[in-house]
């Protein structure tokens, strides 16, 4: 009799524990969705690396295909460069790749994808997402010098290697904001939104976009 009661109580306790665990997972998921929906409309600076207005450090590296490239200066003379820090296992980076290509083509900007990880991961990434004019560089050093802690993260350089804008890029609006802030005469999204003349226009434009 006593053993039966103990077994029943244990079953009830485990049932309550599993129900509580399922409830907590649901709450965590909802918090994540809320955080995503409330994310800033533009690329936000979260690193402590080289500042906007400074010239980028120079890195003599090779692309994943073994071609030498000078990261930190223009790839094509007279054209700006977008350094996009990514990861082979980053789903947002994979989703953002065609958007980066589209925006870069409109802005006539060269793209350098900078990543880290194992050779096998990069081979699989490039197999699933073939390059289309971008350079692909595997270098932990560049990310460390820029102190990038989250990806995808973009750094826009002018033709002389000066940092024009930078920030976390999770959406098309984030990528576009790197260029938009410069056109409006601001170095960062934060300064752009502080401007009483440009902030309302920026918010109106992003509100009218269809996602």
UniProtKB/Swiss-Prot annotation:
Residues 50-187 form the Thioredoxin domain. The keyword Transmembrane applies. GO terms for cellular component: membrane. It is found in: Membrane. Gene3D superfamilies: Glutaredoxin. Pathway: One-carbon metabolism; methylamine degradation. The chain crosses the membrane at residues 5-25. One of its GO terms (biological process) is methylamine metabolic process. Pfam families: Thioredoxin_2 (PF13098). It is a single-pass membrane protein. Its main location: membrane. Keywords: Membrane, Transmembrane, Transmembrane helix. May be specifically involved in the processing, transport, and/or maturation of the MADH beta-subunit. This is Methylamine utilization protein MauD. It comes from Methylophilus methylotrophus (Bacterium W3A1).
